[in-house]
Amino acid sequence: MSVEDWDWSLRLFDHVDLHASDYRESVRFYETVLAPLGVPKLLERGDWTCFANLNVADRRPATQNLHLCFYARAKEEVDEFHRAGTAAGFRSNGPPGYRDYGLGYYAAYLLDPDGNNVEALYRDVGNVGHGVGPRLR
């Protein structure tokens, strides 16, 4: 099976737990950057917060060196994800734009308070004429 043949609508994970060294700041980060993607804060219980499929918990050791990629429904959501995060004082790890990771791969990156690389991705299949092709490693 190839990248082109994969059914990208399939769910691979039910949820992900992220342990935070600064729980409140991590909740603020994810609340800020997930809102433009339509991902709500569903539940908060003391030292644990649920953002749809992502749980943020006040646990040690903190999760680090992780790359999380969230689906965006439009380029504008990717742009707003990055704008909201940087406006709130969080660090950019790459501005919105097309990447050479695949056709129509439009993404932006932010670093959460523990240094995890958090990405918003829109697969712009209607705009593949920008010369970027699949990149496989």
Where do the protein language model's features map onto the residues?
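N-terminal beta-strand motif that seeds the catalytic metal site of vicinal oxygen chelate
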Residues: M1-V27, L68, D124-R137
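Long, continuous compositionally biased terminal/linker segments
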Residues: V3-D7, A52-A88
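Core segments of cupin and vicinal oxygen chelate
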Residues: D17-N55
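Vicinal oxygen chelate
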Residues: A20-E25, F70-D114
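Residue-level structural signal for beta-strand termini and adjacent loop
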Residues: D47, Y98, L121-R123
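Short beta->alpha transition motifs characteristic of CBS
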Residues: L103, Y109, A120-N127
